[in-house]
Amino acid sequence: MAVAPAGGQHAPALEALLGAGALRLLDSSQIVIISTAPDVGAPQVPTGPAAPPAGPRDPDVLLFATPQAPRPAPSAPRPALGRPPVKRRLDLETDHQYLAGSSGPFRGRGRHPGKGVKSPGEKSRYETSLNLTTKRFLELLSHSADGVVDLNWAAEVLKVQKRRIYDITNVLEGIQLIAKKSKNHIQWLGSRTMVGIGQRLEGLTQDLQQLQESEQQLDHLMHICTTQLQLLSEDSDIQRLAYVTCQDLRSIADPAEQMVIVIKAPPETQLQAVDSAETFQISLKSKQGPIDVFLCPEESAEGISPGRTSYQETSGEDRNADSGTAGPPPSPPSTSPTLDPSQSLLGLEQEAVLPRIGNLRAPMEEDRLSPLVAADSLLEHVKEDFSGLLPGEFISLSPPHEAVDYHFGLEEGEGIRDLFDCDFGDLTPLDF
């Protein structure tokens, strides 16, 4: 801290201010005393940067000190480890007293009068762009006889830097349109990629046409299915044929007679039966697929088809030998126009296969199978049965069975006759 030497008339006042603690100064602060009356005895102090007065102000004496930022209150006393370095931050915009005088409104730097005007020899931005350079380079490739271009020659012709040519060739090489022949020579490969493109295009066109035809066919089938579903769900004449009611069953057969109902249901079908004194109901529910129900009613003797006559005549005694619960012969079923589709499903062959319920309860007889016999014994029986058809005896075409099997083989000049030890020339031709 620099203070005016003693002997000046203002030195006691300054020392009193410093002793009272009215001024907060650092060791490196500089104090400048400006007085209206010149002090001959005091040496002149060099003036420096000044700040607002930090103490009481006298009309004849002005004290200025270096501006200091407000220091925060110390949280804890620091240990005395020597003299710590002093850090200062000058805020000249707020604390400094001397402000530069305004020199008028700020004016930006004027535009150079000749900056927007280009010289006649200067190229435009589009002329130096990489897009135009690439087009011109491809023109050079197209005019080349074998597709080989020297990059040094191309840079001279196009009047561009060689690195611009390298930027173009790196991209074209990455998409496999050119290939490097040497350090500064490249070759165009675009014509090779077009080989066979016509055949591929023709094949893809045919595939596309087939897919379009298949799509049209599927659309036509979907339209037919949609129309049929609408007819089934909206037509009143068809809606009454969608279900078979109890009245339809009673119109087919006499309720007093026994009827056989065959149910064909997918796995995991839920069945619920309600048994009462008057009615017997069965409810079926399946989530795996549709449930098919077939009705097999008994027919009267008048409606027996010729194909079933022999079966009923031969099994008449077995039917009479049943448990004796058979009732009177059923009356012929009355025809109903609503059940024509269901009746058409029951063909004569299906009815002939299904006998009465009593026959279904009969135990099945076990078939006794005879043991297998040798082929020679069967051949003897066949010879006895067909002895009058052929003039001679049968000739065994296969060799006799031996203990050790072997594989048959033929040479190039042999045929099937060489596999058998017999003379086929003695056989007479068969006349049919």
From Swiss-Prot:
One of its GO terms (biological process) is G1/S transition of mitotic cell cycle. The modification Phosphothreonine is found at T428. The keyword Transmembrane does not apply. InterPro entries: E2F, E2F-DP_heterodim, E2F_CC-MB, E2F_WHTH_DNA-bd_dom, WH-like_DNA-bd_sf, WH_DNA-bd_sf. The modification N6-methyllysine is found at K183. The modification N6-acetyllysine is found at K115, K118, K123. Residues 65-106 are annotated as: Cyclin A:CDK2 binding. Residues 193-282 are annotated as: Dimerization. BIRC2/c-IAP1 stimulates its transcriptional activity. Residues 404-421 are annotated as: RB1 binding. Residues 39-85, 98-126, 297-342 are annotated as: Disordered. Residues 151-172 are annotated as: Leucine-zipper. A motif (DEF box) lies at residues 156-192. It is found in: Nucleus. One of its GO terms (molecular function) is cis-regulatory region sequence-specific DNA binding. Residues 108-192 bind DNA. The modification Phosphoserine is found at S370, S398. Residues 363-432 are annotated as: Transactivation. Its main location: nucleus. Component of the DRTF1/E2F transcription factor complex. Forms heterodimers with DP family members. The E2F1 complex binds specifically hypophosphorylated RB1, the interaction represses E2F1-driven transcription. During the cell cycle, RB1 becomes phosphorylated in mid-to-late G1 phase, detaches from the DRTF1/E2F complex, rendering E2F transcriptionally active. Interacts with TRRAP, which probably mediates its interaction with histone acetyltransferase complexes, leading to transcription activation. Binds TOPBP1 and EAPP. Interacts with ARID3A. This is Transcription factor E2F1. The gene is E2f1.
